[in-house]
Amino acid sequence: WSFGTNLSQAFYALFSLSSVSANMDTSAVTNYFSTWLYCTNLASFPLLDTSGGTSFIGTWQNCTSLTSFPLITTSSGTDFTGAWQNCTGLTSFPLIDVSSGTNFTTTWRNCTSLTGFPLLDTSSGTTFASAWRDCSGLTSFPLLDVSSGTSFAGTWQGCSGLTSFPALNMSSATAVNAAWFSCTGLTSFPLLGANSATTFSFAWYGCTSLVSFPASFFDNWTATPGASCFYFAWSGCTSLSATSVENILNSIATSGRSAPSSGNKEITIDYNASSGTPSISSAVSTLKSRGWIIVLNGVTQ
């Protein structure tokens, strides 16, 4: 079988399809938009020539019966939006070449059976919104190069199996809202250098096991805070140590950033005052003088 350049939706929603012929000549194909979307009975996939592919939007989305994936050539791919989204049967993922990829929105979202992830070259990626959202089986995450990434909205949301997180370079990030929402297994968090981010709303919401948050996280924060910048950022983080809360407030104070001119100005967080230090009072006073509203244990300071 020989195809032209466009294989868009060619096998879309063929629920009865259980295999794909390895003899398909796909060497000229550039567009794989939703090619095998909703092929829910597809149990395996052959090593096709996908070297010319640039668009892999939704290509294998909802192929829920796939348990593994071949090491295909995707070095020309730029857009991987939703490519393997909802491939809930995948237990592993190969070290494919995605070095040209810029858009990884929802790429592996809800791949719930993945327990680990390879060290892919994601250095060209700019958008990672919800890329690994609801990958609840992940127990570790690699030190990927995401230094060009700007959007991390909901990126690791619902990755409840992660207990730690790598010190990624997120220096270009502008949005990290809900990035680690309900990562209920996280016990500690690293420095990431997210100094260009304008919004952290819901970023660590519901991280119920999070105890340790680093000092100096916001010290070099230079972005202008967006509306509702810290809205519910640490709500539900009931295990945070007093030191971690002090680290957060002291660091925001050190940054010199003032509250946004619009939207919610609250920084709401639970604080174990019995093991705290006087430093928090100074931080609270400084932040209030810059327009922030500080709410500790449900009480406005």
Feature-to-residue mapping (PLM):
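Negatively charged
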Residues: 1-301
